[in-house]
Amino acid sequence: MATARRLDVVASHVRSPAASAEVEAYARDLRRAREDVCALLRETNCNPILVRLAWHDAGTHDARSGAGGADGSIRFELELAHGANAGLVKAVNYLRPIKERYARISWADVIQLAGATAIEECGGPRIPMRYGRADAEGPAKEGNLPDAEAPYGDGASDAATHLRNVFHRMGFDDREIVALSGAHTIGRAFKERSGVTEHGYGAKNGTKFTGCPFMRARADAADGEIGMPGGASWTRKWLVFNNDYFHREFLSEEKGQLLWLSTDDALTTDPGFAPHFMRYAHDQNAFFHEFAVAFAKLSELGSRFIIGPIVL
């Protein structure tokens, strides 16, 4: 996939030459930062954790109060210590050298740039992103992200109700909930992080899809460290972004080796979710299009743009 694309700068409200020059400089650094993220992905195959970081930074948003959102607050130690964010300090540390190299780019933009690039570089759709976000000055409150299994923090009696409580608070509808859940097509869960699986760190604790320290998950079968082996994945090729997550119910022979949570199951059984789940299983193009739009919306929740916005 091409790693350098034209930057269109949308800055109609910028009037002075000095302000225009600032936007252009920011855009140049975004372009360079994206190249550095691509290099990081090629070296480490860290696509899933960068997507998780972008989601967890944005997913604290409350549309009613305007609090939280994609504002870089997850960089603060207090927020990284939230239970839902276990393991994400690793993702922040992956991005820290890039942030330091391009100091004018906000943490909020670096995190969302990395998440979108991670999706695109493992076969996913082009995300219509905008940049120029301001950074938060402190951490978001704990408790706004969804739980994978009961008991649910919002007191919901079932997984479908819990998903709606969390995502409707952010402004997403049922179709968008299912589309965003498709991000589980990449990545793994670990006993030491979420606790939703018995599979933990290390090759001996992985499944047949996650136990090898080298690449079995990439589409090109190229060698490449995956970092810590282990954990459990939702799909067999967990470094390839496609619609395999929605085929999970048809892979009965692999059920013991693949992760499937109550919140995943709700998408296949709830009458409001299931039609979208089945549609994405049969139409990857529809999934890609609707995921890209929903992810772009997610990436701007609670964001305050102080430059541009700049369209990559």
Where in this protein do the model-derived segments appear?
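Catalytic cores of secreted/periplasmic or lumenal enzymes
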Residues: 6-312
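N-terminal chloroplast transit peptides
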Residues: 1-5
